[in-house]
């Protein structure tokens, strides 16, 4: 009886971990759709990331802002 209960608990734990990993895998894709516009706050290491044609300038942390590319 203890073995059956242990197996059930173990199965639930494994299922929970698998679902958490699946959800975590979708977060970067969702975050990639959103971008920060010119003069908005950004963070290259964690997001929000700057829109295309902009880069994240951190002249004074934590005041990082999206600036236009100069090239």
Curated annotation (Swiss-Prot):
Q: Point out the signal peptide segment.
A: 1-20
Which cellular compartments is it found in? Secreted
Q: Which domain of life is it from?
A: Eukaryota
Which residues are reported to carry the modification Serine amide? Answer: 70
Q: Which residues form the propeptide?
A: 21-33
Known tissue expression:
Expressed by the venom gland.
GO MF, any single term: toxin activity
Disulfide bond among keywords: yes
Swiss-Prot/TrEMBL keywords: Amidation, Disulfide bond, Ion channel impairing toxin, Knottin, Neurotoxin, Secreted, Signal, Toxin, Voltage-gated sodium channel impairing toxin
Cystine pairings recorded for this chain: 35-51, 42-56, 50-66, 58-64
Cellular component GO terms held in the UniProt record: extracellular region
The question of whether Ribosomal protein is a record keyword is answered with no
Query: What SUPFAM superfamilies does the record point to?
Result: omega toxin-like (SSF57059)
Q: What is known of its domains?
A: The presence of a 'disulfide through disulfide knot' structurally defines this protein as a knottin.
What is stated as this protein's family in its record? Belongs to the neurotoxin 07 (Beta/delta-agtx) family. 01 (aga-2) subfamily.
| Protein name as it appears in the record | U3-agatoxin-Ao1a
């Amino acid at each position: 009886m203890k073995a059956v209960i242990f197996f059930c608990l173990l199965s639930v734990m494994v299922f929970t971990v698998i679902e958490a990993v699946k959800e975590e895998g979708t977060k970067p894709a969702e975050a990639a759709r959103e971008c920060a516009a010119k003069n908005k706050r950004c963070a290259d290491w964690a997001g929000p990331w700057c829109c295309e044609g902009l880069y994240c300038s951190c002249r004074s942390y934590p005041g990082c802002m999206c600036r236009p590319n100069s090239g």
